[in-house]
Structure formats: C-alpha cells, structure tokens
C-alpha cells in the first residue's frame, strides 16, 4: 500500500486554516451550567456579555437570557471550540490534480470530494446563508470537503456590480479556505446560454480571482456553469479563450468546463451527444468536465450518460438535486441513491444544490434559518437531512 503524503506547505496551510476560526472556550461554563444564579443561588441565566459553551460552540449573550444558546436572537455566535487539530480536506489531500479519468490528491491517489453548492450569491450569499456560523456547520458538523460558490453573471449577479461581487467572492474564498475546504469558484452563466456572451467579463473576473489567490492550493475553477442552446463547438471555443487566462497566472490550476445541454454532455438537448466532446475535446491538460442532474427528472438516460462519459473523461458533478430540475417538487430518493451509488463506485466528486434556505425543496434549510442563523438539524428540509447523511457516510 502506498502511503499518502502531505507536503510541508500543504500541512502548514491545513493547520493554519483548521484553527483560524477556533474559539477559546477555556474557563467558560458549559450549558446548562449558567454563569449567573437566581435569588435561590441556583444557576439560571446569563447576563449581557456572558459566554456559554453549547454543543462544542461558544456563544455570547446579547442581553439577559435564560434561553438555550444558539436557539434565539439573544445569543451571538462566537465560534467552534478549539478541541485540538482538525484534519481538514485540504490538509488531507493537498493540491488536487487530474490523473487518468479521475480526480486525485497531491499524492496521485484517486479521491472523491463531497460537498455543497451555495445558491446565488446575490440572494443567499455573504452575511446571509454564508457566514462564519454556517461555514463552521458545513465544515465541522457536515464534514464536507468542498464548497461551490455560485456567482450568477446575470439575474442580478456579477454584471450589476462586478467590483462588489468580486470582493464578495474574495471574502468567501478566504472564509472557506480558513476552514480547510476546497473552493469551487463557479462562473454561473445560465441565461443567455452561450458562454461566449460573457467571455470578456469572465476573463476579467478570473484574472482578478486567480491573481489574488494564486498562492492557495485549494481552489478549483468552473468557467461555464450550464451552457445551453448552443453546440459543443461554441463551448469549446469559449474554453479556449478563458483557460489560458487562468493558466498564465496559475499554471497548475484545476479547471472545469461545463458541457452542452445544461452540462449533460448533450443529454438534455435534442441535437447533442457525448460523441461531440469525444471528437473534439478541450485541448488542455488538468481539465475536468462537469455534469449536472436532477434525479426526479433525469433518470436512466442521464445516469447512463454520466456512466459513459466518466469512462472516457474526468467528470465532476458540480450540481445536482434530489428533485425536479427547477429545484423544486417532490424528492426522488430512489433515483438519487442510484446516482450516489454510481458516483461512489467511480469516485466521481459532487456538490449538491443548495446550501441555503430558499423556499424550494432543493434548499437544505427551512425558510428563515439564514436570518436566524440557526443551522441545526431541526432546521433541515427533507433534502437537506438526506444529503447531509450522504456527505457524512463513511467519515
């Protein structure tokens, strides 16, 4: 058996990141051992500024309260308690690379990443569903490997405020990196479906992101979310323009390219097919192709396409749901489990849509969870509870 190794650099980054947001919980009472007593001399409450540990998490009271820490507005989240070195995904695997038809660690061992995708940053981003608390939950409680940060280009996204959304992406990359997560930077073009429509904006965005974060070993780049309404040749033409922009700054960057038919290798369009990519693949190394599915709508035909494509190309399922492709409707966990089994067997990495409290059934949390900053299991929707269990499986 070959031993997995960790370079001194990746180990140092992992150790720094795993402890960057750890709270000092020493000499702090643990709930229900209240710091303040009632007139009978029994521990009963907290005063303004008092701290209390609950579920390995440090909270501070905003005002007098006898409520359970973390369950209401009376408590301010401080951070996860530092209980020792937490081995992060980045510390474990180092800089990722493509080897053969799979994703591999720095030690060239085949791996599978499992994690979550954000919703659109313009709706559920920084300070809303993506906060210190929610990222701690994703990293430490869910034990995710990767967070996909979905930056819509249109629909109130990047094109409305390029500087503001680029800065938000910078901050979120730093926050996720501090927890040792892999970060999938998602250029979420959707409508218009031709990625060439946004090619100049993409060049500007990736130049700024890659330049600032080129020292990191945990970033992955998805340059085209869901190309649609155009043939594979148009997607390939776009990739040929954007990939060199990234590679000129970070030569060993791992880059993902969406495929025609909403990233289905043509399965979701009438005149496209996997053969289009086989005949004319992207002419760069260290490239993966993305595949998306929604299990209630995309059953055997799409599942077979994923199976076929992953025999030939390195594939990353950067978005999927257990429901309809609208992101809503009933969950189909039978179809979803078939996909999970296929991806586990072939070590296909995935990120599930989505880590938010959006009203649709595809969101992990119930509406209002982000506003209250309550990300407990009691706040999970059916899909959220199911996907959390899949991320934790075998940990």
Describe each region flagged by the PLM.
Residues 199-220, 224-349, 353-357, 362-393:
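Extracellular glycoside hydrolase catalytic/binding regions
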């Amino acid at each position: 058996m070959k031993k997995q190794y960790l370079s001194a650099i990746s180990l140092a980054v992992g150790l720094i990141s795993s402890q960057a947001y750890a709270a000092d919980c020493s000499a702090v009472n643990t709930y229900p051992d209240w710091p303040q007593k009632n007139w009978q001399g029994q521990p009963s409450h907290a005063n303004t500024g008092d701290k209390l540990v609950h579920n390995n998490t440090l909270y501070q009271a905003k005002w007098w309260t006898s409520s359970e820490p973390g369950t209401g507005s009376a408590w301010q989240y401080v951070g996860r308690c530092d209980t020792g070195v937490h081995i992060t995904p980045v510390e474990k695997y180092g800089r990722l690379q493509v080897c053969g038809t799979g994703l591999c660690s720095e030690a060239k061992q085949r791996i599978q990443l499992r994690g979550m995708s954000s919703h659109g940053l313009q709706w559920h981003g920084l300070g809303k569903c993506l906060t210190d608390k929610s990222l701690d939950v994703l990293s430490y409680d869910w034990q995710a490997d990767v967070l996909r940060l979905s930056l819509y280009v249109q629909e109130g996204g990047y094109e409305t405020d390029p500087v503001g959304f680029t800065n938000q992406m910078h901050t979120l990359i730093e926050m996720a990196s501090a927890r040792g997560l892999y970060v999938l930077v998602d250029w979420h073009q959707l409508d218009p479906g031709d990625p060439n429509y946004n090619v100049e904006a993409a060049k500007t965005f990736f130049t700024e992101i890659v330049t600032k974060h080129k020292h990191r070993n945990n970033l992955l780049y998805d340059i085209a979310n869901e190309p649609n309404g155009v043939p594979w040749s148009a997607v390939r033409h776009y990739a040929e323009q954007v990939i060199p922009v990234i590679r000129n700054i970070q030569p060993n960057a791992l880059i993902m390219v969406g495929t025609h038919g909403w990233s289905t290798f043509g399965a979701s369009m009438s005149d496209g097919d996997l053969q289009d990519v086989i005949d004319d693949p992207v002419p760069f190394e260290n490239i993966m192709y993305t595949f998306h599915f929604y299990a209630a709508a995309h059953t055997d035909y799409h599942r077979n396409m994923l199976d076929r494509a992953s025999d030939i190309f390195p594939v990353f399922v950067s978005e999927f749901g257990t429901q309809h492709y609208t992101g809503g409707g009933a969950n189909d966990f039978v179809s979803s489990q078939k996909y999970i089994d296929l991806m586990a067997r072939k070590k296909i990495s995935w990120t599930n849509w989505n880590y938010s409290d959006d009203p649709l059934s595809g969101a992990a949390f119930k509406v209002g969870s982000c506003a209250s900053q309550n990300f407990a299991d009691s706040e999970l929707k059916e899909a959220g509870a199911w996907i959390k269990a899949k991320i934790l499986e075998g940990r």
